[in-house]
Amino acid sequence: MKKIDLENVVWKEGKHYVSLNLNTNISSFGNTKNEALKCLQEALELYFEDTSPSKAQKVEQPDIVPLVFRYA
């Protein structure tokens, strides 16, 4: 079985944890970090049933950078 390395981010939003895959922009959520990642894994498995892993955008060394957004 082949494998692909994917970059993911998890954060708490209200009562839930949100998980986001940076390579595909697919997200999921759960009551814990582990549950959010497990649900993301399931969503990615469904996604890759119809899409080639080569379609995943390559993300190397992602960095979280703060940005102040000004709006009216």
Regions found by a protein language model. Give the residues of each.
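Short aromatic-glycine-(Arg/Gly/Cys) micro-motifs in beta-strand/loop hairpins
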Residues: I4, V9-N21
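Compositionally biased, intrinsically disordered low-complexity segments
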Residues: K12-E13, F29, L67-A72
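A short, exposed loop/beta-hairpin motif centered on an aromatic-Gly-Thr core
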Residues: T24-K33
